[in-house]
Amino acid sequence: MLGMTRRWGAPLVAGAVLAAGVAGAQEWETVATSPYVIKVRPRPGTKAKDIWAEGELKASALQIQTALEDQGSYRLFMPYVKESRVVRPTDDGGRLTYTRLDLPVVSSRDYICHVVTESKVAADGTGVYQQRWKAEPDAFPARRDVVRLRLNEGSWKVEPKGEGTSWVVYKFTVDPAGSVPGFLANMGQKDAVVDTLRAVEKRAKSLGVDTPPSK
């Protein structure tokens, strides 16, 4: 049975910031097939790219859920994240979060997100974890030394596969808020997204969450 809750958190978007600087066709383009499938497409009228990444992580859905719910700790394991905190709860049962990214070559970026947990994996390991987020860039004033991201939305979906593994779908769209060198865009499409999924996997496996026995 799905545990239905509404809570907020902030995902990593560094890969999207690096990837969004290069235009292309408006159909999905597969840029990687291993270790994860990664697809990209430009969003019309913006500098943003839609990113779709999915694949198997060697951690239980409960472990991954625990890692992704703890937005305040993203700075400890997510690539490029230098600051992450929960700002305040929201009236709908969610929360507002703040994240600052320290990126190579380009200026630091930050974003404020209103993120909701739509469903959770139960203690027995059944169900699906789903989290969605959307930027609220004007929730409080921007910092003078950091570029504020205004378009940032996406979702996580985690389904248990058994034997301590999970299938993860990570979708997001981010406007980079400025020019991004081509080599960084290419890295963002592949390496940074892969690094994010691997970071989540590593963090999840390190957490003391019991993995339900296989049925």
Model-derived segments and spans:
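Eukaryotic helix-grip
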Residues: 25-215
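Bacterial N-terminal signal peptides
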Residues: 10-20
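Bacterial N-terminal signal peptides that target proteins for export
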Residues: 1-12
